[in-house]
Amino acid sequence: MAGNSFGERFKITTFGESHGPALGAIVDGCPPGLEISEEDLQVELDRRKPGTSRYTTQRREPDQVKILSGVFEGKTTGTTIGLLIENTDQKSKDYSNIAGTFRPGHADYTYTQKYGFRDYRGGGRSSARETAMRVAGGAIARKFLEQRLGIRIYGGCTQIGDVKAESLDWSTVNNNPFFFPDESKVPALEDLINALRKDGSSIGARVEVFADGVPPGWGEPVFDRIDADLAKAMMSINAVKGVEIGDGFAVVNQRGEQHRDEMTPQGFLSNHSGGVLGGISSGQTMRVAMALKPTSSILIAGKSIGLNGEAAEVVTKGRHDPCVGVRATPIAEAMLAIVLLDHYLRHRGQNADVVPPFPPIPG
């Protein structure tokens, strides 16, 4: 099965299914000498793991990561890093009622059309459970970026349904179960999620992530633009249906004199571009947003078909997130870190000796 690897110089390959015995990742390209431990990875995994609040899936997975290779005496060796997380709370019987039907809005139908077969237990390989390994691999990239290069990655969920963040305090996102930067909206979010659970339904969300301290010059021309890789990274996350870089789709209503990020010797006057110009980092804050659809795993009956094309009605049982965006922030941050470290290594490989004609202006 192709499509299980991401990155060029810093590459992560994941494996495993939602209801299989374990999930795993192979991380290639991490420079040697980086101090790293299972505890470093666990901090990020604990932010993503299921069952941590009553507003997410009640599947309880400890998501305890094991480093199998590539680390010796607390430092990366420069060789392949092997990571493993065991699944411990599968309830495959919850999915026996959909073994012969396709859940509308899920990958059941398309996987069967592609492979002629599917793992119906929790979505198998198409489950968001896979993203645990992205977070583990991304934690390695994140620590390198922070420790070696001083790059700070952060983000949060800025909208769930019609509840929007009106103030943005990114230092508070880990203080509430929604990763929401506007704590005044938390009661409204609690009411919304409780109502969705009562109705057996779900809702979409918007997640935004940022990177401060990225120097100018990262990214490759044309097909390997850094914003193109960011878009691919975010679109590869389950349920993501749209990605914005900088002002994104708002540029439709902007005039040229509004959108262009004017420059002075003292720095940029705006950041509509989201820190990327011509596919190459500008030195400004990188800003990426994504829209996540409402999950189709709901208790409201829906029309579908069976394995032989016959009409069927589907009700999805099991333990599911009423809003998948609630746990998406650590995943998006991890993918941002992976893209940035990959492009840092690519840039260093070709352009390490390049000296620009003048110092970069402040972002």
Curated annotation (Swiss-Prot):
Which Pfam families does the protein's record reference?
Answer: Chorismate_synt
| Protein name listed in UniProt | Chorismate synthase
Domain of life, per UniProt, equals Bacteria
Catalytic activity reads:
5-O-(1-carboxyvinyl)-3-phosphoshikimate = chorismate + phosphate
Q: Which organism is it from?
A: Alcanivorax borkumensis (strain ATCC 700651 / DSM 11573 / NCIMB 13689 / SK2)
Give the E.C. number(s).
4.2.3.5
Cofactor binding mode, per the note?
Reduced FMN (FMNH(2)).
* Broadest EC class assigned to this enzyme: lyase
User: A Gene Ontology CC term for this entry?
Assistant: cytosol
